[in-house]
């Protein structure tokens, strides 16, 4: 037996061992809490309960909010659940009394259901609950709540005063107590119970009259008082007590007794004495069929003498005559008593109170009065009290327990410490937000600058230069400028004489002399370059360098051609020049926007050692880079980075290789073909090696940034391959062929059945929606065909089903092809929310409340599973059968809307949350709204999506908000809406979630929305859905689209 008990305890069924000690609650108990409370019988569990109780006591004393009733309500509910056995440990009576005494002066709680619940709990502890309800009615507490009249009527019904109970119900209905439908329902149930009892009573009386049965002794009979005016315990008499006193208890007389007409009927009186019984009429002597059974044998036996002495006044029971008393005879001897003997002292026997505390008598003065009287006396005492306490008495005796001054000081210190830490965290969070805003602003400026530069580079025109001599490179005569930015290039010397000294060679020759001077580095002198350029060139045309000439950009192919035609001597001279490292310059300083210098010259492109000279590189140089494969990689990474909307800052790659005066180079140095020479100076090779290292590091950073993008196709594909094998699921199938062409009227094989495409419903960027029907059925089903071979929707559905278990019933199947996939859902006769917006004249207040309520519950489940949807738009939501079949009550109110597109969803359990929220489609729709910068979590994007959808349904336009200094509010006014208070609370709550958990926010909003679903609401809702179903049903939409030339819709 002991082993079985231990096994039950191990299995978590401790409550099975102590069912009889658990006090039942009308609203039931939480099973997990009950098992935990019963398992915490040890000292550790008891200590944990005491700590939680201490926390509630502290919260009551130091509560600074505007709803103190909430703390008491949570404290009492926690006590009920964690002390299932009741008793002195729970101290429920004192707890309820202190709560009522503390809140009795708050008139705002008089019609609060929580405050009325406290009074009802107090009524269960009172001697006369009816007096308490009369007192509540006189004070106006709970008179507008249905629960007040229901509980009051139940007390009268328990006392079988059905008339008064019915009067109480009628009074509540006349006052229209809320909720009125619940009160009326309880009244009807009460009337049915009374009617049933009346019919049963009539039937029992008829049965007793027709078939009188011998009464039986009742066991465990009730001793509860009955009656309306006088309370008297019922007297149940059975067996021989109901017969006439003259009859025998053993056998009945065979001969009936004659009834004398002039003889009075005597009634048995149990309170009459023995003398009065002799006056009763004696029965007529009749012959006995059998000897009677003696009634009192102990009185018929002759008692024997116990002693020869009888006390005076005693007489034998069988002799009514008086007997003379015999005087007592004293003994004729005297017992001997020793003189030295002492009387033995008896030790008093005292029972241990810990053992026999149940049977100990109650001490005088321990009798406690009625709780209602104590509450009333406390209220009168508070009204009459005029003393002023000079210490914090309210904090010492606020709760049930008592706090010392040291404990109060400690709690005050902890509270201040907590506030200081929260302020520090808030300050640090604000600083992070400001830094993030600055970074985003810098990114936007950089992107704008790059866009302008790309436009200028894309529109740049290139002209072919005429060559007079195939061995020479000439300068184009026509000026070419675009958007006010001068075009730059690397210039080759015009002289065919290999011994002619170019300006760049002059600079290089002067550099050894400059090393010995006091100057730290030499500066390029343009005038000197112009003087040297005036020397005549042999074998070529004279070039006037007094004035700088316009330049032209050579294409890569042209440069390669000219390099082949130039003589080897000229190439050798040119390869001795060290090309400028633009990558080293760009990555060697932080991102600072620099204005291009229009007075720059192409000669600076060859002066690599002149670090103080400003250089400006144009973006078109990427198009003529020496390494086309590296260029494609860089462009690909740039595209991925733009897709992720996240710019990587290369501040960690700061390399101090040049002088302090460093500016961004705009020269097209990559266009020069002479940098490919294999013979170069050692410094040139070292710089080239360092540039290659920097390019590799930058490429790795760009790749990591692309992988971190949650919407990157390659990243999603790698994630699906590493996490799970989709082919192992029965709902997933793979076809090793291209995706079939989806056209209206054609058949497509989906799983074991063939479907016929009826109509194209919606066309989006990367997927399309079709209405299809099985070949053997006319029921329309919606499928989603995507051009991406990544079944991300199916993955999200699997994760939701895995993490939510039975709380998620959305089923879908997927078929993957080589170049796409198709997902079809198990819903029939459904349409998107986009169709509903196109028929806004049928959208009523009830339909909007139903849709938003469904959306709140769905998104709450997504966030519990750590998944962000990111695209809560009309095109991604479908309306289920609850809309088209409003009288089908099998489907609940929270099954009307479902999500069918998870293209923008992010699984935060396996994906990093360090990304820009602007990648969500909801953020793209609300672009320009300042509230987006206030999102501290990806989950908040879904809250804004719900708010935008509600705004779209109510005002027919997207969300517009503003900051009033304290809260985010709508630009539109909700005062003209039906149930404007509900919508005002909804938008204020969902727009100002701040750092709170979105799961709790969504749960609270769903509960508040669900409170509107009463009988009247359902009546209006079903009427509106019936009208709407005729318009947006799939059959009606197919008919309308067949009449239109377009057919498919465009996304919202």
UniProtKB/Swiss-Prot annotation:
One of its GO terms (biological process) is apoptotic process. Residues 146-179 are annotated as: Necessary for interaction with KNL1. One of its GO terms (molecular function) is protein serine kinase activity. One of its GO terms (cellular component) is cytosol. The modification Phosphoserine is found at residues 360, 428, 535, 659, 665, 686, 1033, 1050. A motif (D-box) lies at residues 217-225. Its EC number is 2.7.11.1. SUPFAM superfamilies: Protein kinase-like (PK-like). The active site is at 871 (proton acceptor). Kinase activity stimulated by CENPE. The modification Phosphothreonine is found at residues 781, 998. Interacts with CENPE. Interacts with PLK1. Part of a complex containing BUB3, CDC20 and BUB1B. Interacts with anaphase-promoting complex/cyclosome (APC/C). Interacts with KNL1. Interacts with KAT2B. Interacts with RIPK3. Interacts with the closed conformation form of MAD2L1. Interacts with CDC20. Belongs to the protein kinase superfamily. Ser/Thr protein kinase family. BUB1 subfamily. This is Mitotic checkpoint serine/threonine-protein kinase BUB1 beta.
């Amino acid at each position: 037996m002991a082993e079985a008990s231990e096994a039950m305890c191990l299995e978590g069924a401790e409550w099975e061992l102590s069912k009889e000690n658990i006090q039942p609650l009308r609203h039931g108990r939480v099973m997990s809490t009950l098992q935990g409370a019963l398992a915490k019988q040890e000292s550790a569990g008891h200590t944990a309960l005491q700590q939680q109780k201490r926390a509630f006591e502290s919260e009551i004393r130091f509560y600074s909010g505007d709803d103190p009733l909430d703390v008491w309500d949570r404290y009492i509910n926690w006590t009920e659940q964690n002390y299932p056995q009741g008793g002195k440990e729970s101290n429920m009576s004192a707890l309820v009394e202190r709560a009522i005494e503390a809140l009795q002066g708050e008139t705002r709680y008089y019609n609060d259901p929580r405050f009325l619940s406290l009074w009802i709990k107090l009524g269960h502890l009172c001697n006369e609950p009816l007096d308490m309800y009369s007192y509540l009615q006189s004070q106006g507490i709970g008179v507008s709540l249905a629960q007040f009249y229901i509980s009051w009527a139940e007390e009268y019904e328990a006392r079988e005063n059905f008339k008064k109970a019915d009067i109480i119900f009628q009074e509540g209905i006349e006052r229209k107590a809320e909720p009125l439908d619940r009160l009326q329902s309880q009244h009807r149930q009460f009337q049915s119970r009374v009617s049933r009892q009346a019919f049963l009573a009539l039937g029992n009386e008829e049965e007793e009259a027709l078939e009188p049965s011998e009464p039986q002794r009742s066991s465990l009979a009730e001793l509860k008082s009955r009656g309306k005016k006088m309370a008297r315990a019922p007297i149940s008499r059975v067996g021989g007590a109901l017969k006439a006193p003259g009859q025998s208890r053993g056998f009945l007389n065979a001969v009936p007794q004659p009834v004398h007409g002039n003889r009075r009927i005597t009634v048995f009186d149990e309170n009459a004495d023995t003398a009065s019984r002799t006056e009763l009429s004696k029965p007529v002597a009749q012959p006995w069929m059998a000897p009677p059974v003696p009634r009192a044998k102990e009185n018929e036996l002759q008692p024997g003498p116990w002693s020869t002495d009888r006390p005076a006044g005693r007489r034998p029971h069988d002799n009514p005559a008086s007997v003379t008393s015999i005087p007592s005879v004293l003994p004729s001897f005297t017992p001997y008593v020793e003189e030295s003997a002492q009387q033995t002292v008896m030790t008093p026997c005292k029972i241990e109170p810990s053992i026999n505390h149940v049977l100990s008598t109650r001490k005088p003065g321990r009798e406690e009065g009625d709780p209602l009287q104590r509450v009333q006396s406390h209220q009168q005492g508070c009204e009459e009290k005029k003393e002023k306490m000079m210490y914090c008495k309210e904090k010492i005796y606020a709760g049930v327990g008592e706090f010392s001054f040291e404990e109060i000081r400690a709690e005050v210190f902890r509270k201040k410490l907590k506030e200081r830490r929260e302020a520090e965290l808030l300050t640090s969070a604000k600083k992070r937000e400001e830094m993030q805003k600055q970074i985003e602003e810098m990114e936007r400026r950089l992107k704008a600058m790059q866009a302008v530069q790309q436009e200028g580079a894309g529109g740049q025109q290139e002209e072919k230069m005429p060559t007079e001599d195939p061995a020479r490179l000439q300068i184009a005569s026509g000026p070419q400028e675009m958007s006010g930015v001068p075009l730059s290039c690397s210039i080759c010397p015009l002289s065919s004489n290999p011994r002619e000294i170019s300006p760049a060679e002059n600079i290089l020759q002067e550099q050894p002399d400059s090393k010995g001077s006091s100057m730290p580095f030499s500066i390029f002198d343009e005038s000197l370059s112009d003087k040297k350029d005036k020397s005549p060139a042999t074998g070529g045309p004279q070039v006037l360098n007094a004035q700088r000439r316009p330049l032209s950009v050579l294409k890569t192919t042209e440069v390669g051609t000219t390099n082949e035609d130039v003589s080897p001597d000229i190439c050798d001279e040119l390869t001795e020049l060290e090309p400028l490292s633009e990558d080293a310059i760009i990555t060697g300083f932080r991102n600072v926007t620099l204005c291009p210098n229009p007075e720059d010259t192409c000669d600076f492109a060859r002066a690599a050692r002149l670090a103080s000279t400003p250089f400006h590189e144009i973006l078109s140089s990427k198009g003529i880079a020496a390494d086309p494969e590296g260029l494609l990689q860089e462009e690909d990474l740039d595209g991925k980075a733009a897709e992720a909307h996240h710019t990587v800052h290369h501040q960690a790659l700061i390399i101090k290789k040049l002088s302090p005066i460093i500016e961004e180079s705009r020269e097209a140095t990559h266009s020069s073909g002479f940098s490919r020479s294999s013979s170069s100076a050692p410094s040139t090779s070292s710089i080239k090696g360092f540039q290659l290292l920097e390019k590799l590091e930058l490429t790795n950073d760009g790749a990591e940034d692309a992988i971190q993008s949650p919407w990157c196709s390659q990243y999603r594909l790698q994630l699906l391959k590493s996490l799970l094998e989709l082919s192992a699921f029965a709902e997933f199938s793979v076809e090793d062929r291209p995706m079939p062409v989806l056209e209206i009227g054609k058949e497509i094989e989906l799983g074991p059945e063939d479907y016929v495409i009826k109509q194209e419903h919606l066309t989006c960027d990367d997927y399309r929606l079709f209405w299809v029907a099985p070949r053997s059925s006319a029921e329309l089903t919606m499928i989603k065909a995507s051009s991406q071979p990544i079944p991300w929707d199916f993955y999200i559905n699997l994760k939701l089903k895995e993490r939510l278990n039975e709380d998620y019933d959305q089923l879908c199947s997927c078929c993957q092809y080589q170049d796409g996939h198709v997902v079809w859902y198990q819903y029939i006769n459904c349409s998107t929310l986009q169709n509903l917006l196109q028929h806004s004249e049928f959208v009523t207040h009830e339909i909007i409340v139903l849709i938003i309520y469904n959306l709140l519950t769905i998104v709450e489940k997504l966030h519990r599973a750590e998944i962000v949807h990111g695209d809560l738009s009309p095109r991604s939501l479908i309306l289920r059968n609850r809309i088209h079949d409003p009288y089908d009550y099998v489907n609940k109110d929270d099954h009307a809307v479902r999500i069918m597109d998870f293209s923008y969803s992010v699984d935060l359990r396996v994906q990093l949350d360090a990304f820009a929220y602007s990648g969500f489609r909801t953020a793209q729709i609300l672009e320009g709204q300042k509230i987006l910068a206030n999102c501290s979590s990806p989950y908040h994007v879904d809250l804004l999506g719900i708010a935008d959808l509600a705004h779209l349904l109510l005002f027919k336009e997207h969300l517009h908000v503003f900051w009033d200094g304290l809260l985010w509010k709508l630009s539109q006014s909700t005062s003209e809406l039906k149930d404007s208070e509900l919508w005002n609370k909804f938008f204020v709550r969902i727009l100002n979630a701040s750092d709170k958990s979105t799961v709790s926010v969504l749960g609270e909003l769903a509960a508040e929305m669900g409170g509107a679903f009463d009988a009247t609401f359902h009546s209006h809702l079903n009427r509106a859905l019936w009208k709407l179903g005729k318009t947006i049903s799939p059959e009606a939409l197919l008919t309308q689209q067949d009449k239109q030339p377009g057919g498919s819709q465009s996304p919202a």
